[in-house]
Every structure is written in C-alpha cells, then in structure tokens.
Amino acid sequence: AMGIPRSEIFVTSKIECCPGSGFCGAVQGAALCLTKQNATHNIEHDFDVLGLDYVDLMLLHWPCDDMDASVATYKAMEPLVASGKAKAIGVSNFNASALAELLSRVDIKPAINQCAFSIAGHTGIPYHGFNWGRDDATRELCEANNITYSAYSPLGGWAMGGTSHVLSDPTVNSVAAAHNSTAAAVALRWVTQQGIVAVTSSDNPSHVAGDLASFGLTLTDSEMAALAKVA
C-alpha cells in the first residue's frame, strides 16, 4: 500500500465460530466453523482473500454456544504460529469464564482478548461466553495470564442497543477543556491510561493526529474516577 513495506503494516484478521442460533445466528444467518476442519477452511479462505503470506494477528471473533466448537476453532489456529502464517493468535469478546476454560484446553495462550470497552460501557447481552462491557473479572484474568486486553469501539461508537453519548457528554468535555484537548482524546486516554490497547481509526488526518495526541495527556485520579461514572 503506497509503497509502505509489509513489515511496517500490522494486519489483523478474524475467523468466525458460531452455531446457527442465538446472537451469532441472527447476525450470520448460518452455521460457521463448527469443526476444526471448517475452521481450517475459513482460515485458508482468509489468506486467499487477503492475498498475504502471513498476518500479524489472527483472532477467533467470538465464543460459540458450544465451548467444544470454540476450542476446536482455536486449535485450528494454533499451527499458524509454528508455520509463520500468523505471528500471534488470540480471541475477541471472551468473558472470564469462557477465557478460563479455553486456557485450560489449548496449547498456545491467546496473545490478546479484544472486547468492546469505552467510557460509555456497552449493553450486556445474554449470550454464552461474551464480554460486552466493563468486565473487571475478564481484565483481571487477562492481566494474571499476561494476555493483552484490547478495546474496540473505545470512543463508544458501536454499542448494542443504541448509539454512544461519549463525545457529547458534559463530564468528558469538561475534562477535555481542562487539558485544552478534545473529547475524543480524553475518551481514548481514559482507556489507554488503564493499560488497555485502544483500536480506533479514521480517514480524517486531523482526527488521526488528535487520537495520537491523546498519549500526551495525563488524566488525574479524580478525572479517571469521574469519567468512569459517565456510562
């Protein structure tokens, strides 16, 4: 892309693991990755579509109804590390109980657990294994096992059940004004200052610059506490 060496681009891909029922069935409309063989097929399909020899990170998108299926899918990802086709593998949307069981049944520990996390919080859903919101137990389990906790939608953008109010929240904007910064930068710094990796993007150069500038902020303990009450 634009002459940038592949080694300077971090590529993450995800494979699905869902039975054709419940939340996943409603989204996908079909059974996916129910066996290790199917998972392997989906992995190969990803590489064909991407046209790459390797990815930097391959994630299991979410847990299945059946933990056996989650384990089978994850174990299909494990050979990617030895072959060099994935520099690391991990999971997404796994809560503490699902992650603990996975850890007890696989050979390669997930490098990362990517979950929805922001000042806004995220509406929980009654679905096996999911972490959708501020789940201290999941974060603590990740920390205890040296698994990176990563936040998607760190600005509260996509949340089950509605839109986010983060960028218009009075508390967020008050803290931003005190630091001569923006609401987005404060929201991102609230996440990263907790040692969480924030995943965000923009095609607006000024927004990208603002996001990067968030690392120059240091929020006080009282500001962190006040922002935690915004949800």
Give the role of each language-model region:
Residues A1-S13, P19, D53, A72-A76, ...:
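N-terminal binding-site loop/beta-alpha segment at the start of enzyme catalytic domains
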Residues R6-G20, M58-H61, Q114-F117:
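A short, structured active-site edge motif that brings together acidic residues
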Residues E8, L52-V55, A86, P110:
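Local beta-strand N-terminus motif with an aromatic residue
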Residues I15-N38, P63-D68:
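Active-site mouth loops of central-metabolism enzymes
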Residues F47-M67:
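Active-site groove signature of glycoside hydrolases
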